[in-house]
Amino acid sequence: MSLREKTVLAVKWNLLATVLSSIFGLISLWLLSHLLTTQDYGIISAALIICTFITVLLDFGISNSIIRSKELERIELSSLYVINITLGVIACLIALIFSQQIASLFNADDMLATQIKIMSIGFVISSFGLQAKALLTREMNFGAIAKITIASTFINFVSVVLLAWIYRSPWCIALAFLISATANTFLSTYAARPLRTYDLKFRFSAVKKHFRYGIQLVIDSMINQVSINTYPVLMSRLISLSAIGGYNIAYSISIGLFEKLNPVLSHTLFPALAKIGGDDSKLRSALLKITTYSAMINFPMLLGMMIIAPSLVDVFFDAKWQFIVPIVQVLCAAGAIRSLDTPVISVLLVKAQMYRNLYLGVAKLIVGIPLTWLLGHKAGLIGIVYGFLIIQVMNAICGYFFLLRPSIGVKGIDYLKSILIPSLHVAPMVLGGWVARYYFTPLGEILNMIAVASTCVLTYIITIYFSPANVIREFKELVTSNLIRKITKQ
């Protein structure tokens, strides 16, 4: 199978896993928003933020280092496996020992500390399966990875729904995380058994190069997590835990929902781009095309969600969550800008230049924290969210000048064109959607949402169909040929 065929197959499997995981996630989010109070949902959101942050330590960039390595010796894999497990134990101990202090950071009570303690056990369990997933990714065995993701997500979904329905308490989420982490580790280890040619031996000299590569990734990831999670932490201190709960729901049905497509691109692009990493000309061409293609998917979905947000929240959520409508809309705009980052990060990974993103991350923190604090004091929750939007605009502009141009020499006019083309093609959809929203207001929220969504989809399809741009014609032919191939196979 050629590299192109492997990449296309990988995208399909990742997309399937992402879609099903998103469906399970949305259903559980909807159920929990009805079953729990705003305060309880805030506790859950804070616990998940902490869990995500600590999980960054578990991998330490080792997985990406394994994926990009042309050859791997047995002692390398053995030593890296030992490091993963050691980091899992360290992360667990940190969470257990400092659970009370972490909870106080969010102005929370003992319930959050209990959540953290339960989740900490999952860090050790997860560490045993990290290398197995890295090896499967390196071999581009995305079919197995997708099946594992779907199975563990379904197990998490069933656990969350059943426990929350019975006990109506935040700790149910922590226990469900523990159950799904166990399932994911077991399934990953089993699927990767033919690739596991290592034991529990350790030699520091065998992992030096992986540390040099991984340290850039883990510091960058930690800075990124601090940057993202600064906003909910400030919400808890300036407003309340309920504000975090509302922000989490808004994020999940806007940026979070569509950001799940980013791993579909990054997890499949990285191994594929690694094969052409030595040819900057090919990398530039691939980056520009991928930027346009991903924007053609992300822009209409996020901006479409921004338009239907008032109806969506009114139809699916209780009155206690109506305050999240403007938050969803601002986050959708921020998400559209943020989606441009995925191809850039893939290129930096291939070129082993993640230190560039690290410096940019520090700059975003220096600007973002005081800006967000100021806007939060002035305008409350919506001010904090606007702070997030401003930082995303800054990141997109600086991303070209400090990341792309120095790493592979992309011309500014070419990169701007790759963004402007999808932006211009989505503009008629946005205009038509806003007009339809006000025109169909008398129909009621449910019919209004359906009518607006239909208008947006139809307008976008027509715009794409009649587009004179060559890259759009290529995009259209790619989508059409895949659909025809699927139909003729049936």
Language model regions located:
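Interhelical loop/hinge segments that connect adjacent transmembrane helices in multipass membrane
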Residues: M1-L3, T7, G143, F186-N229, ...
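Hydrophobic alpha-helical transmembrane segments
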Residues: A113, K117-S120, K147-P194, K209, ...
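Membrane-interface junctions at transmembrane-helix termini in multi-pass inner-membrane proteins
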Residues: R4, V8, S65-R74, I125-T149, ...
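Helix-loop junctions and terminal segments of transmembrane helices
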Residues: T55-R74, T137-R138, A250, S254-N298, ...
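Alpha-helical transmembrane segments of multi-pass membrane transport and lipid-handling proteins
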Residues: V19-I23, V82-N107, T114, I118, ...
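Signature of the first transmembrane helix
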Residues: L3-F60, L87-S99, I118, G122, ...
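Transmembrane helical elements of multi-pass membrane transporters/channels
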Residues: A10-G25, A176-S180, N184, S188, ...
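Membrane-proximal transmembrane or re-entrant/amphipathic helices at the cytosolic face
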Residues: V410, Y415, G433-Q490
